[in-house]
Amino acid sequence: MSEPTAFPLDESKLPFKIPKDTKPREKIMKLGQMITDRVPAKLRRLTVEDPEYWGLASIVTDEMADVALKMKVRQPMTLPELEKATGKPAKELELLLYQMSCVGLLEYNWENPRREKQYILPMFVPGSAEFFNMNKQQIADHPEVTAFFERMTFLPLEHITAMVPPGGAGIGMHVIPVEKAIETENHSLDIEHISHWLKKYQGKYAAGPCSCRMSRAAMGEGCGDDPDDWCIGVGDMADYLVETNKGHYAVSYTHLRAHETKANL
């Protein structure tokens, strides 16, 4: 029988200690198991040793978990729908949803025919594990979210990466090249050009910190880059980043030129 492939997290090398409650919080257990896409964690009860538990427990209150447990992963719900599902008054619920969005447990957009605000409980990666790491002060207050992000990028795919063909087969993140890098190509698709996306979203554009760089630096690792302004949000995501203190609005082409210079340093 082959050895297990799991690469354990060496907590002794972290510049912080991951707190693991002696008495598990049941609502956090349920929420972690509901969101995770890690197969072993779906098939058994979570423990305080699981990153799905201690990652959420560090930043999510039981009241937040109550609301999130009324949702389904990646299924949008409007405020009236959530009001009905939770039984909470609209004003109280809206404030709580905003707090959940600020910490990064929820995202929101207006992507429906009525342009009505809708809330989404995302998966961990891509999703809340990244959002947890897009606020410098939040990382300082809850450094365990950095290790949680690392675990949620590694563990769900550890047994299948050897089977993924070149190109990724639709798994993971896909890169849009710097526009100048494809100017000399004979053929390229519109969606391969950053300018296509900027025009599509009519210049609504925000820049935020790189959650990858910022989290690894907090773990005592990383590449040494300045983490600010690497991540781009367009359209509704731009509003989400700004309104939840994860980014700032930016002038698209000015920012991209600065970004190209920064990347080439």
Regions found by a protein language model. Give the residues of each.
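Long, low-complexity, charged/polar intrinsically disordered regions in eukaryotic proteins
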Residues: S2-D50
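Long, Pro/Ser/Thr-rich low-complexity/intrinsically disordered regulatory tracts in eukaryotic proteins
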Residues: M152-L241
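Short helix-coil-helix linker/hinge
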Residues: S58-A65
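Short, amphipathic alpha-helical interaction segments positioned at domain boundaries
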Residues: K117-M152
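A short, conserved structural fragment
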Residues: S101-E111
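Conserved small/polar residues in nucleotide/adenosyl-binding loops
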Residues: T254-T261
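Short amphipathic alpha-helical interaction segments
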Residues: K88-Q99
